[in-house]
Amino acid sequence: MEDGSSLPINTPRNQIILGAPTEKKRDNLRLLGKVTITPFKDLKVIAEYTFNRKSAETTKYDNKFEYANGISNFNKESSIANSKYEITSGATDYTALNIYGNYTKTVGKHDFSAMAGFNQESYTYHEVKSARWDMINDNLPSLSQGTGAYENKEAFSEYRVRGLFYRLNYSFAGKYLFETNGRYDGSSKFPSESRFGFFPSVSAGWRVSEERFMDWSDSFLSNLKLRVSWGNIGNQNVDPYQFVPAMEAFRPNWVVDGSKPTALEPPALVSNSFTWEKVSTLDFGFDLGLFNNRLNMVFDWYRRDTKGMLAPGMELPGVLGAKAPMQNAADLRSKGWEISIDWNDRIGNVSYYLGFNLYDSRTKIMKYDNESQLLGKDADGKLYYREGMDLGEIWGYHTDRLYTEDDFDVNGNLKPGIPKVEGYNPNPGDVLYVDYNNDGLINNGTNTGLDPGDMRIIGNNTRRYQYGIRGGAAWKGLSLSFILQGVGKRDMWIMNELFYPHYDEFSTFYDTQLDYWTPEHTDSYFPRLYQMSKGNTAANTMTQTRYLQNGAYLSIRNITLSYSLPKKWLTPWGAKNLQIFFSGENLFTFDHLPKGLDPERTVTDDLGSRGFTYPYMRQYSFGINLTL
């Protein structure tokens, strides 16, 4: 400093070193109880009770310290204007009661079973937060050792679910199978007039292989069962009190008579008629077993319709100054399929198996009141839906190339006919986008599906063609098994510190980020960089095809090698079994992303998210299983 003293520079590392740590204590209490009564043969009455309390106490101290800002002559600055000590205590109580009866009966070739019961769940959350400013002593912060203002807050939330349920099963000779289920549930999250819903389901199966007319296939057909099912379930995944026009007190920034007054926020618009989402699923499938069940195949095709999806309702005029209330505003449809194939066999003393499964699905919005077809997210970060929209779609710009010096005249101005991002003046090395509407400006129009400007759908972040491969072999006590898992297709938009070079002033440069534009290196992958990510960084990092990543991958989930000692070696020692094993988890992943990015854990976000997530750990295990 100018006075000869020294201070740490304001870096993230020094903020951690000089700042006070946050302490958190957690407790988890869980009680379970179960009673089973058998009044008479074939009938069991079961009562189950669960209580779970999770509590936490967090102590946080924002202490005040001085640092050198490192920008303008290393001026001395304070981390905060006033120190603050804060204690937050909260507890969540969950209780569940289930009382149900099971009845089974067999008469000849007829098998019958029935279940009926009652269910009730309750959830209660209570939190108290107290804070005070200006601590006398940084080493002994407490609410009583402050000289500044107090702040006290309290939060409370609860909801209840109560319902009846049943299940009926019938089969004849193991060939004709029938099942029906149903629930009648009520939730306090919904208005009293629309609190309850009935959710039935039914399924049937036919074991064709057991029919006499299939006797000709006994030499190779072990099992053939056709299945069909349809069912409804209810979804109440919405915050409580959405139908209550509540007001919240707050302290505004203005001062009246020397102090901040207490003000009330006006209540939000509410709906008194929204209710459960109803999710109905239609499924067709078959189970196939061949060659004494050495080869097995299971296939399912399904269509899932969500009716009355809970979402903000129709658009309201901007002059109203309020958001649309929660309503059953949308319908969506998912279609998908899944296939699983397994082979088990033995060759001499070697037994082995190999399995493969593959599934895929897509989801489309079938109905939503969004006449202007707004794109993106609202102020609360919730996605705008629109009719015909595929969930997961990525809107962005098609990248043409990077600007070159030939795109500018001798005065540094763009030549006629070459577009630029609206509001920015490009330089050589910046990103040049495709101007679809030929107006000379790259923009998102009105940011709607009706007028997206130069934006187009450039990808979809839904995981497609997810698959798994498993296999193993055993020979005289020695066995080896493996599990592979992967995704066949996925687009990922990644724009964070781990992907983009010089993300902010304290970013680390990784070796995967060194291919950036310079006047001497014009055929680079990354564009021109700007100090502290200013300049045209925002224009260069708009969602685009150039940096859209391929999220497909194959991961080696597990490899296990084991050896079981012969029983004749163990009998003299009084042991029944001794197995030695070595196992590896999450060993390798083959993907298309830059080094350091995990296709399963990577944060896909715009500039503003640092992108750090904890990856799946690679683990090695060695152990002995002994049975006496």
Where are these predicted regions, by residue range?
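Conserved small-residue
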Residues: Q242, N344-N461, P501, D511, ...
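Aromatic-residue-lined binding/catalytic grooves and analogous aromatic/hydrophobic interfacial grooves
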Residues: E405, I469, L626
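Glycine-rich, aromatic-lined ligand/substrate-binding cores of catalytic
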Residues: N460-M495
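Extracellular/periplasmic, surface-exposed regions of secreted and cell-surface proteins
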Residues: D3-D62, N73-G392, A539, T543-L628
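Extracytoplasmic gating/loop element in the C-terminal half of outer-membrane beta-barrel translocons
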Residues: N14, Y67-G70, S187, P426, ...
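A structural signal for short, well-ordered beta-strand segments and their strand-loop junctions
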Residues: I46, F65, S481-I483
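Intrinsically disordered, low-complexity regions of eukaryotic proteins
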Residues: S5, G289, S340, N411, ...
